[in-house]
């Protein structure tokens, strides 16, 4: 498994001087270190997870966001057992997003399995931009819109405005 810290550190849970220096210089975060250690622990028992490439980990409130390569996210989406194992190890809800995805694909990943109908960029008079997302279905879906907005802002600095369009 590839991670932001070296494999020995991920297995031992103690950072070498090189990784410690990267942490001190903010090249990596404590969340990256925590995610690397926990995923490596799972990778010891799971061949699929052992093939993952963790790009970074981000803690958002009580949830954790794992930024992985696209094929790794596909593997996770295809196996609820892997998702359950990872969430059990982390002890919290874990979100999976693709590292090399466009902003549109990133937003679709966050709203998965809900269907995203449209994504539009809205420029505000003060020069800032807002991304308007229209989701198919009912706003009463089991979808934590505020959490998705916070994750998008934290991970990619995208401000979301979410609307629902019900089918008629």
Show the residue positions of the predicted features.
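Short glycine-rich, basic-tinged beta-strand/loop micro-motifs
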Residues: 58-70, 125-138
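Short, low-order "capping/linker" segments at domain edges
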Residues: 104-118
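Short, non-transmembrane amphipathic alpha-helical segments
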Residues: 76-90, 141-159
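A short amphipathic beta-strand at an alpha->beta junction
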Residues: 87-102, 156-168
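Short, flexible, solvent-exposed loop/turn segments with mixed acidic/basic and small polar residues
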Residues: 53-59, 84, 119-127
